[in-house]
Regions:
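Glycine-rich phosphate-binding loops of nucleotide-dependent enzymes
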Residues: 2-263
């Protein structure tokens, strides 16, 4: 899905974004500008507001104030499916697939939904061949071609996450949000999955929320550190690792510890 041309050279922009629940402000004036094709890791302690931020970007929550822009187009007030068809897609922390459908059927559903399938029989027939071809392509991209007719419920956890990645990119979105994509995986599965993410998101803008520092520092071009609903640092992995504010607020020795353990 090609982005609609807009006045901005940035793929995604957050401008003084705020979100309150009752009297509690969870997101406190976040500003972020992400160039097309950049990979951004979002880290921070539990309760920092990372998932809320993803929900604001993807349209699940409406901002209290501020703006979310996709290639210069304001997303405020748009529903998640509208945002998806504008070129932004997300995966969730909890695997979000159709367990009783096969791998192929899951991917085909993702393709048809992204096409704006209107549930009319003639349009369904017209779209079906293209959707089948795209689903086959997605199976190859996610290394699931040998699992084509296996029900999703019978896949390993890592395979289910790969399937969800396939569904997420099914419509060709240019901006991808991944929420803890490697959570629950073994070290070897994580290593393979990072490689898969890099392969299937080539040329795309990627934002990833992740607690595994090895994943974040190995995947991201830039890292945004969120603490108490604010971005306290946004820089390259090396610069963030050396930032005293980040170490005091969040990282401490965790990066060094994880790297020493081989993460």
């Amino acid at each position: 899905m090609s982005p609609v041309a807009g006045p901005s050279t940035m793929s995604l922009e957050l401008r003084d974004l705020r979100k309150s629940f009752g009297k509690t402000e969870i997101i406190r004036g976040i500003n972020l500008a992400v160039p097309a094709g950049e990979r951004v890791g979002i880290i921070g302690p539990n309760g920092a507001g990372k998932s809320t931020l993803f929900n604001l970007i993807s349209g699940r929550f409406e901002p209290t104030s501020g703006d979310v822009l996709l290639y210069g187009q304001r997303l405020n007030g748009k529903k998640p499916f509208e945002i998806n068809r504008m070129g932004l897609s997300r995966s969730f922390q909890i695997t979000n697939i159709f367990p009783k459908l096969s791998v192929f059927e899951n991917l085909r559903c993702g393709v048809l939904w992204s096409l704006g399938y209107k549930y009319t029989f003639l349009k369904f027939l017209a779209d079906l061949d293209d959707a089948n071809d795209r689903a086959e392509e997605l199976m190859r991209m996610t290394k699931l071609e040998k699992k084509r007719d296996i029900l999703a419920v019978n896949l390993t956890y890592a395979e289910q996450r790969a399937l969800e990645i396939g569904i997420t990119i099914a419509g060709g979105a240019s901006v991808i949000l991944l929420d803890e994509p490697t959570a629950g995986m073994s070290r070897s599965e994580t290593s393979r999955f990072i490689k898969l993410i890099k392969e299937v998101t080539v040329g795309k803008t990627l934002l990833t929320v992740e607690h595994d520092m090895g994943v974040v520092f190995g995947l991201a071009d830039k890292i945004a550190v969120v603490v108490y609903g604010e971005i306290i640092a946004y820089d390259t992995p090396d610069a963030v690792r050396a930032d005293q504010r980040v170490q005091e607020a969040y990282l401490g020795s965790s990066v060094a510890d994880q790297q020493a353990q081989g993460h």
